[in-house]
Amino acid sequence: MLRYAVIACAALVVFAGALEFSDCGSKTGKFTRVAIEGCDTTKAECILKRNTTVSFSIDFALAEEATAVKTVVHGKVLGIEMPFPLANPDACVDSGLKCPLEKDESYRYTATLPVLRSYPKVSVLVKWELQDQDGADIICVEIPAKIQ
């Protein structure tokens, strides 16, 4: 019996630190998978190293057609949301998406994110949104991260 208790406790320790991506208000879609290059999903936060570029993808299913898709990114530090400017916010260009997006289909959005040397070494909750032509969130994903 003690052996099973030890195994259960060890499993809780492993899963307690596992990285979780959470939905932050998806309206017309649902993300099914998030993959971040070099991210250790056994940790509570994804480590983003300064002066590198991170590649990632989000798989999602769409419940309504979208004629245009815009990427909006914020970083939340100490409860304060700060916008993250993107060189190309048009998610229909160079991101694996071809607009218009059809309803009841699945898609993979891909992006690269520069982690600049000037960024402070801090824990941040990255809020990644894909918005439709009306500004409604198709998907909204929160990614716990730590800049090092």
Swiss-Prot record:
The keyword Hydrolase does not apply. GO terms for cellular component: extracellular space. CDD domains: Npc2_like (cd00916). Its main location: secreted. GO terms for biological process: ecdysteroid biosynthetic process; intracellular cholesterol transport; positive regulation of defense response to bacterium; sterol homeostasis; sterol transport; synaptic target recognition. Functions redundantly with Npc2b in regulating sterol homeostasis and ecdysteroid biosynthesis, probably by controlling the availability of sterol substrate. It is found in: Secreted. It holds the Pfam family E1_DerP2_DerF2. GO terms for molecular function: cholesterol binding; cholesterol transfer activity; lipid antigen binding; lipopolysaccharide binding; lipoteichoic acid binding; peptidoglycan binding; sterol binding. Belongs to the NPC2 family. This is NPC intracellular cholesterol transporter 2 homolog a. Broadly expressed with a higher level of expression in many tissues, including midgut, salivary gland and ventral nerve cord. It comes from the Eukaryota. Glycans are attached at residue 51. Disruption phenotype: Abnormal sterol distribution in many cells, also lower than normal ecdysteroid levels. Npc2a and Npc2b double mutants undergo apoptotic neurodegeneration. InterPro entries: Ig_E-set (IPR014756), ML_dom (IPR003172), ML_Npc2-like (IPR033916), NPC2-like (IPR039670). The keyword Lyase does not apply.
